[in-house]
């Protein structure tokens, strides 16, 4: 491959779609001399990305896993309230509901859910959340309708190593994140599509850099890079494929590839749809090879936890905003990636103000 080249990038970091803002931490009295973190909600609207008459509200909850009672105890007072021990913060995505009601009431309904959880295992350690009780307004959410959700423990629990394999575990919602998006805009690329490779293909990757607002004394900085302006994280996402030869069998030049990429008119944003996520919007025409990577309206959602669980969990508790985006053209197989140079194209727009909010209490 040719050596890398860089093309100027336009972005406006002031727009709400480039940022996810933090929940302020508010403590409230419990009445028994103790304090607890006040439940809160946040609403982000991405309905300006696509003209649509039907919007959905995606619901992501953040809360804490408690162990209820002491399984080793053999005696005790019958009227005693069982002891609740805080084990870890966690995230549970409920799914979506039509945007037809009061969003604040929707958030309040999430706080009344009764959810238990337990560990399981397949090829990965799993956390199985069981919905015991949920208000009627949430019944159309996928997780509530199914009564359970089995998720990768590393991606959805802050400290899965603290969760025991036995005992009664309860998940208590404390923060509710509501994202309003056009119904057809949320498209998660099938894993099979992401694994396609071939010597006659180029891989298109998105190198996303995210600024993270974090105190220099925080242990989180050990997982972040540092610049003069603060701390940041890097993500690498597979966003498409392009052929190395044209219809006449001739090798496609990088100039032609760059022209095709620019014609996609890509924009990138941060949101909380399936947990902290990078959203990609292609407003231009897409080739047959690129079509499976986007919805019919040209959007794609990349949960950050799939690329880097560690970065995703940092974004549970810290404000973040897009810093830069580059499109990297790589060879179509991992073997050739190892022995060829990459090619950079930085013509992607950063949606203004796409910010991720911090949830400060989520610490190990």
UniProtKB/Swiss-Prot annotation:
A motif (FPIV motif) lies at residues 23-26. GO terms for cellular component: viral envelope. It holds the Pfam family Matrix_Paramyxo_N. One of its GO terms (molecular function) is structural constituent of virion. It is found in: Virion. GO terms for biological process: viral budding via host ESCRT complex. Gene3D superfamilies: Viral matrix protein, C-terminal domain (2.70.20.60), Viral matrix protein, N-terminal domain (2.70.20.50). The keyword Cell membrane does not apply. Keywords: Host-virus interaction, Viral budding, Viral budding via the host ESCRT complexes, Viral envelope protein, Viral matrix protein, Viral release from host cell, Virion. Late-budding domains (L domains) are short sequence motifs essential for viral particle budding. They recruit proteins of the host ESCRT machinery (Endosomal Sorting Complex Required for Transport) or ESCRT-associated proteins. The matrix protein contains one L domain: a FPIV motif. Belongs to the morbillivirus/respirovirus/rubulavirus M protein family. The M protein has a crucial role in virus assembly and interacts with the RNP complex as well as with the viral membrane. This is Matrix protein. It comes from Newcastle disease virus (strain Beaudette C/45).
């Amino acid at each position: 491959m040719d050596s890398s080249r860089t093309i100027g990038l336009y972005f406006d970091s002031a727009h709400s779609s480039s940022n996810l803002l933090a929940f302020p931490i508010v403590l409230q009295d419990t009445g028994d001399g103790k304090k607890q973190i006040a439940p809160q909600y946040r609403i982000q609207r991405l309905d300006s990305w696509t003209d649509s008459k039907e919007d959905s509200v995606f619901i992501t909850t953040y809360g804490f896993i408690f162990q209820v009672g002491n399984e080793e105890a053999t005696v005790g007072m019958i009227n005693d309230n069982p002891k609740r021990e805080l084990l870890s913060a966690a995230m549970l995505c409920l799914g979506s509901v039509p945007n037809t009601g009061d969003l604040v009431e929707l958030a309040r309904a999430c706080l009344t859910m009764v959810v238990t959880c337990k560990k399981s295992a397949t090829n990965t350690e799993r956390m199985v959340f069981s919905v015991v009780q949920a208000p009627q307004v949430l019944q159309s959410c996928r997780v509530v309708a199914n009564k359970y959700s089995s998720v990768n423990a590393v991606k959805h629990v802050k400290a899965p190593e603290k969760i025991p394999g036995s005992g009664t575990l309860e998940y208590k919602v404390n923060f509710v994140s509501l994202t309003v998006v056009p119904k057809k805009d949320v498209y998660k690329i099938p894993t099979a599509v992401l694994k396609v490779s071939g010597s006659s293909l180029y891989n298109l990757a998105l190198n996303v850099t995210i600024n993270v607002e974090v105190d220099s004394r925080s242990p989180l900085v050990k997982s972040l890079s540092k610049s003069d302006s603060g701390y940041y994280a890097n993500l690498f996402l597979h966003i498409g494929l392009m052929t190395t030869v044209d219809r006449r069998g001739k090798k496609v030049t990088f100039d032609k590839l760059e022209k095709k990429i620019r014609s996609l008119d890509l924009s990138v944003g941060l949101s909380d749809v399936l947990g902290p996520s990078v959203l990609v919007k292609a407003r231009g025409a897409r080739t047959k090879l690129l079509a499976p990577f986007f919805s019919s309206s040209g959007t794609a959602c990349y949960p950050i936890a799939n690329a880097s669980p560690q970065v995703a969990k940092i974004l549970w508790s810290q404000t973040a905003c897009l810093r830069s985006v580059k499109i990297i053209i790589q060879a179509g197989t991992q073997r050739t990636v190892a022995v060829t140079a990459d090619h950079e194209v930085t013509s992607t727009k950063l949606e203004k103000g796409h910010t991720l909010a911090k949830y400060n209490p989520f610490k190990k």
